[in-house]
């Protein structure tokens, strides 16, 4: 179960949420988005901080990570400060880009881990940044596509996520992860089977077969 973060020790699983100041956008265009993702990846590699899931939205960002030796506070400070300086210079503005304090929840339990991965990676679909699951699989500002194998990002820890979803092989990525996503959409978000069939590009009977599989949620 989640609880409010009181720890900043290495090896702690955190769901981090950062919002723009006064709910304003934190990215204005593709250059901003690419810059934020580049900084996240470079810092994750430099500090050996595992990133399991992430989604960059218009006015906030979700990151599921395991704090490394640097600790969460210093990691987030470097990420947000570096990006804010670059953002302000590029857009010729001054002042805060993010709310003063990011929100962090310490997470326990394998079941909650997989649900968080689904929740975070479904955000672009939920707010209609993408129109369907096919677009989500190719959306470059969310970690979902990387888990499925495209695009490859060395800094995103896909193997740990795939292990929780029940596979480690490249061949097993798409059917296993897609199955879990489809079940999550039906059971947690009430999306109609016919609509999921349209989004995924398979038949209604195919969706129903997915829903009757004995994979754990």
Question: Across the structure, where does each feature detected by a protein language model lie?
Answer:
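Short Pro-Cys-Gly-centered "Cys-loop" motif that presents a nucleophilic cysteine in a tight turn
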Residues: 1-53, 57-58, 66-217
